[in-house]
Amino acid sequence: MNQAKPSTLTFWKITAALSQALLWLAVACWVMFGLAWMALHWVIVPRIGEFRPRLEIEVSKVAGVPVRIGEITATSVGIIPSFELKNVVLLDEAGREALKLPRILAAVSPASLLQLSVEQILIEAPELAIRRDVNGKLTVAGLDMSKDDRNSGGAADWFFSQPEFVVRNGLVHWVDEMPNGTLAAPPPLTLSQVDFVSRNPLNKHELRLDATPPAVWGERFSLRGLFVQSLLSTNKGKFKDWTGEVFADFAKIDVSEISRYVQLNGQSGKGVGTMKAWTSITKGNWTSTTADVSLAQVDATLGKGLQPLALQSMSGRLVGRKLNQGFEASTQNLQFQTQDGLRWPGGNLLYSQTNPSQKLTKTPTGDVETADPTQAIHDFKADKLDLAVISLIANKIPLGAATHELLTSLAPQGTVETITAHWRGYLDAPTALTAKGLIKGVQI
């Protein structure tokens, strides 16, 4: 008679033991889940009011500021119970009300309790004030955001660990007391009907904000973000671990109103129209932005000492991208019409700058990293350039003094079908230059 080998018998014994252990483990998990569910519905829900002081303490630890809860009730309908909190107040360092939330709804489950989270948080009709004083100090709901608060990281981790966080019909006030360049501080701005959703499944973060600005600003706009981070990351709120894209959709916007609050190099602009923009983020750092714009009555100053550029209309795609040691800017199908009736035919442009590596330079105050700008490498590609239009607007765009004088004196006409240029150093005085292209109908 054939007998099973000892090794074979050992294998089957181990397999049977493991199977039995896994079965008992599965049963134990279901039993624990059932006990947690019963404890939730039979112990916590009926006595939720007794947990209010303890809940205030735990929430205060997470938020990093004192939190007071006026009232808390629980409703057990179906598998997942819901909790309602009223008159939730966050206090500042002086004990004053920094933020008041009239009504908060929270749904929990046994699984979320084991993770110290909730299934969903819904906040209705909150009102938030954001202020920047004359010294640049930023406060949100009366809380100083300029402080290096160690608790802020824990609060962000907790927030972005919640499966779903929803805000409906909120009100946000932005008060800026700091002068904007050469202009006085702008008037307060209020965003109404603010809706916000944050979903955080596994290692993803899905964000959406919709808000209605004042009528003079334009129409309701939408901001959306989709990010991922490593599954091994233990800090869900650490933005430096996030990689993804932000999308902005403005159905109608008045650039002149934005210029009162956001100003670049002390310059301002005007224009009414639509804009969509996509911004890419890698490990918390900006990498590129693509914007589709369609504006009318454009009036912008593009640099110090330049005349305003006035256009009847402008449309096309604008792209900015960060390189390893420089940047790249381009346009696609850019079209515009000047106030004099001249039309830009809709060509494409691409400009890139690669900066030289920085070197340590000894100074009286210590070693400083510097780079020689005369060694910077520049590349330019374009097609369908109307020389007459360029000549007309030359003193309104940042081309350099020498280029301005040359175009003004020559007043060229014609079309550059294609052009490619490569140079090193400053455009006014390059140390090396190569260029080639095709020009039609040139007149000087």
PLM feature spans:
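Short coil-to-beta-strand
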Residues: D241-A251, A291, H378-F380
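N-terminal type II signal-anchor transmembrane helix
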Residues: N2-A63, L128, L385
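Solvent-exposed beta-strand/coil patches in large extracellular/periplasmic or lumenal scaffold regions
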Residues: G142-G181, V194, R199-P214, K276-K283, ...
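Secondary-structure transition motifs
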Residues: N2-K13, V65-P66, S82, N87-N200, ...
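Short extracytoplasmic
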Residues: E58-K86
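Short, proline-centered helix/strand-breaking motifs
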Residues: V59, K252-E257
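Transmembrane beta-barrel strands of outer-membrane/channel proteins
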Residues: I123, A248-F250, V293-L295, A382, ...
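Outer-membrane beta-barrel proteins
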Residues: V108-S112, L231, T279-K283, N355-S357, ...
